[in-house]
Amino acid sequence: MRRDKMAWIGILSLVGLLAPVSNVAKADDFSTDNNLISKSSEIEPADPQSAFLVSKVKILERFENKTNLTDVELKTLLSLVGFKGRDLVVAWAVAKKESSGRPLAYNGNQKTGDSSYGVFQINMMGELGPDRREKFDLDSNVELFNPVTNSKITFHMTKGGKDWSAWSSVNGPRYQEWYNKYPCKS
């Protein structure tokens, strides 16, 4: 009995080793008898960069129109749209200071000159609104409640996280508190 099992294991191992070689050899003999395939299929080697981009897009899709974000989700989203290193920490702290990381945050206080939307409280007051809608191809200010859209626009407005001059909250005491609370510091 034991001897039969060993023989079967040997046969299956041999088949397992030869099957891939056999399939590669048959790939050139691809037939079109069923009329479903018009010519030989060639499999291109996967580009690691494109595989990463596909997975990045898939992960970003999970954040589309999300109505709340955990601290770690916010960090992940900001990293996916392009913030890196210290700029990522700054972006996270600004988002927490501006909206507590809430995608649906809105400040419509006209006395302070605000009509600000989303995670980064992008201000659309007065002439800023039409200008920014055109520049960022927005049909409506409401699109800024989408955390992916809001974060991508902020990444662009801050020149990749290098220029936060449009945000008065940077370097204030509340910002510094959030900066010090950044999750996942390495």
What are the residue ranges of the model-derived segments?
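Second-shell loop/turn segments in exported
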Residues: 59-65, 76-82, 106-109, 136-147
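Catalytic and binding regions of secreted/periplasmic enzymes and modules that target cell-wall glycans
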Residues: 90, 109-111, 117-186
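N-terminal membrane-targeting segments
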Residues: 21-23
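Secondary-structure boundary/capping signal
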Residues: 85, 103, 162-166
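Short amphipathic alpha-helical segments at helix boundaries and their inter-helical linkers
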Residues: 95-115
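Boundary at the C-terminal end of the N-terminal hydrophobic targeting segment
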Residues: 25-27
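N-terminal Sec-pathway targeting helices
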Residues: 1-11
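Export/targeting segments at the very N-terminus of extracytoplasmic proteins
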Residues: 14, 18, 29-101
